């Protein structure tokens, strides 16, 4: 009898963190669990309901929403419920505010005739582990980061390395227990970790959350063993159990790849249809990052000088960004490159763009979702990590030889001539090792999510585990 039949009816609570890069992949995992006959309740605050609406429509009998209001926090302006709308200094406040859902969520559980038997929640919601323990159920940590990055995050909070010279931002922090012994200058470590203050209530709450992640029943990762085998094995060794599930790449189901992009999706894809295979550079720095005007100028100059075809996804700057000289596309640039490139403001159908045969190179900030989407689509990456886990992700890409370094850091301004040369050479040089390697990993990614693939096997093992 198939595992999915055995487990029909098991009720799971899924709790995503309200940030685009965190929510979408956990919702893609939720879809995979739903088609395996699990009953799922997704917890969101009211203003995040539209993000899960397509999933609710696709699974009307097995997936439902639990709406709980976001508890107030002095650092979060009224009406804001998603990280993308937060002031720059309020990221940790969202983690703390969501922690105040402990009692309302416990009350909801106790009033259910058929309460969930397990919780799957984002690694920024570590407090749900304590709730699960109180309720006598299992909590699984969902990591929107890969296995190497998660190894670094767990190592930071478990061992708490410190600088010898507290004034030296470049001091190297070493991770000798992690395979290949990565090391990073202090400034490249997680900003959440770097801002930890011993004894500060919010800092201690966040630290406790990550330690609770380590203590949780299992870890679910958007990666696949063929890409990160050594780091998946390391996590199992560090955690002392094998409940680490590499279930990626988690991508939107079927033809949903363009639906996330809004009204501009069809225009972009139609334009790409006019381009030859592997002739287009895609430029995107994620849903949160806004470049300085100086960086915008250099990227624009690099694209212009290279004479390559391109799609450049630009996050719409706020009034505050504009006042601080962030996010401006150089005047006249779009006219000068008309017909050769597109500048798209706002959200774009990234999976569909990367999957298009015309796209051959991706200038990326190395956010993990972007990495997984590019690997799956067989697109060579030019790396410009800027924050958080992006430096670990870039390390992995260089280690596996599927990425070429451009620069690193959110303050650096690269040379436009060097950038132009990278754009043109990375598209034209079919013999380079990185292109061969990305082709091999794309094949592995496809096999991982195919019949009898490693990630499908891990999904089935997870479904089986959820219902024990």
Swiss-Prot record:
Family: Belongs to the UDP-glycosyltransferase family.
The entry's keywords: Transferase
Database matches in PANTHER family: FLAVONOL 3-O-GLUCOSYLTRANSFERASE UGT89B1 (PTHR48047:SF8), GLYCOSYLTRANSFERASE (PTHR48047)
Enzyme class: transferase
Disulfide-linked positions: none
Residues annotated to bind UDP-alpha-D-glucose: 287, 347-348, 365-373, 387-390
One Pfam family in the UniProt entry: UDPGT
Keyword flag Transferase: yes
Role played: May glycosylate diterpenes or flavonols in leaves.
Protein name (database record): UDP-glycosyltransferase 89B2
Protein origin, superkingdom: Eukaryota
Annotated InterPro entries: UDP_glucos_trans (IPR002213)
CDD domains for this protein: GT1_Gtf-like (cd03784)
Gene Ontology MF term list: UDP-glucosyltransferase activity
Enzyme Commission number(s) from the entry: 2.4.1.-
């Amino acid at each position: 009898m198939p595992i999915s039949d055995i487990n029909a009816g098991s009720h799971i609570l899924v709790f995503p963190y309200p940030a685009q890069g965190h929510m979408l992949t956990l919702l893609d995992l939720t879809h995979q669990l739903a088609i395996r006959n699990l009953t799922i309740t997704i917890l969101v605050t009211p203003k995040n309901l539209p993000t899960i609406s397509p999933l609710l429509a696709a699974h009307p009998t097995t997936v439902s929403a639990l709406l709980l209001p976001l508890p107030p926090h002095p650092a979060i302006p009224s009406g804001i419920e998603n990280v993308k709308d937060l002031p720059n200094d309020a990221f940790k406040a969202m983690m703390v505010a969501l922690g105040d859902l402990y009692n309302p969520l416990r009350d909801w559980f106790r009033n259910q005739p058929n309460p969930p038997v397990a919780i799957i929640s984002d690694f920024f919601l570590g407090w749900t582990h304590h709730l699960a323990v109180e309720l006598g159920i299992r909590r699984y940590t969902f990591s929107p980061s890969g296995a190497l990055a998660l190894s670094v995050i767990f190592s930071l909070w478990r061992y708490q390395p410190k600088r010898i010279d507290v004034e030296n931002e470049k001091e190297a922090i070493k991770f000798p227990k992690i395979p290949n012994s990565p090391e990073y200058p202090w400034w490249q470590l997680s900003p959440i970790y770097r801002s930890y203050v011993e004894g500060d209530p919010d800092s201690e709450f966040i630290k406790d959350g990550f330690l609770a992640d380590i203590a949780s029943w299992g870890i679910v990762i958007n990666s696949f063993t063929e890409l990160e085998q050594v780091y998946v094995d390391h996590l199992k060794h560090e955690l002392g159990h094998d409940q680490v599930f590499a279930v990626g790449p988690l991508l939107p189901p079927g033809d949903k790849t363009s639906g996330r992009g809004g009204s501009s999706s069809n225009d972009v894809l139609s334009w790409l249809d006019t381009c030859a295979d592997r002739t287009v550079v895609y430029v995107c720095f994620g849903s949160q990052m806004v470049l300085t005007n100086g960086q915008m100028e250099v990227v624009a100059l690099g694209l212009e000088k290279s004479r390559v075809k391109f799609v450049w996804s630009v996050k719409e700057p706020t009034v505050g960004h504009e006042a601080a000289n962030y996010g401006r596309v150089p005047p006249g640039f779009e006219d000068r490159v008309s017909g050769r490139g597109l500048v798209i403001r706002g959200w774009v159908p990234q999976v569909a763009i990367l999957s298009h045969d015309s796209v051959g190179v991706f200038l990326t900030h190395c956010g993990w979702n972007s990495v997984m989407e590019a690997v799956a689509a067989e697109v060579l990456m030019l790396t410009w990590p800027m924050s958080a886990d992006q430096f670990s992700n870039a390390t992995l890409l260089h280690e596996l030889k599927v990425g070429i370094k451009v620069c690193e850091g959110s303050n650096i301004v690269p040379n436009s001539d060097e950038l132009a040369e990278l754009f043109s050479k990375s598209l034209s040089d079919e013999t380079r090792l990185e292109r061969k390697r990305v082709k091999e990993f794309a094949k592995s990614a496809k096999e991982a999510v195919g019949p009898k693939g490693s990630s499908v096997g891990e999904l089935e093992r997870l479904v089986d585990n959820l219902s024990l």
